[in-house]
């Protein structure tokens, strides 16, 4: 335990610039840019904003203000507009409820040309992890927002609040080809490491090793790669030097891989669907496995 704590202290000190902390300004990677390629003949789509409770509007204004400070969105004069939603997410360490602002890009997605780049096969990843002894999981800080949009594509992402009209400078969540762009970037950043000492699925990285020496050397190599490309990590979501980790809904140890019991319990507690919407939600949850 003492050796582990010493190692973690060394890593946190040596790579302190890698961790995104409260009130930090999120950096922008030099590894990729995102392009929104539209079908021929598409004209700007302008959808009326959804009606939202006043309390949610205040939360949206707070989040947009922070996005402006971080250089993620900017005031816009775009003819495009997609409506906003705000959805709950898991409470933070303080136990306070949190909300995520989401732009509904469904109409834009229908007019966007797709990208056939595949995501990794989760089953194949799990098949190769069970024989290792030491693991570290790394989570990218607001992953998509670390990628710039190509010049001229920002207006397509425009949205409105009671404070004004805005557009993204960085890659937002919900665009059709965002996962492909992010996965291609991470595959490039960690080239020749994926499949030998780590796997990456979008913004989630798992390092696996059979010895402490191998683990420590490979972790530094991965962190050096991320630093080179100006990519930041979310410290509270990282799991360092563990013999058991939770990754992509699975618990991984040197004894093998099993489904995360918390995810299984959630499925078991899910009420019997009574309409198509509930059935779709249930199917989306179980089909992951």
Language-model segment annotations:
Residues 1-289:
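Retroelement reverse transcriptase polymerase core
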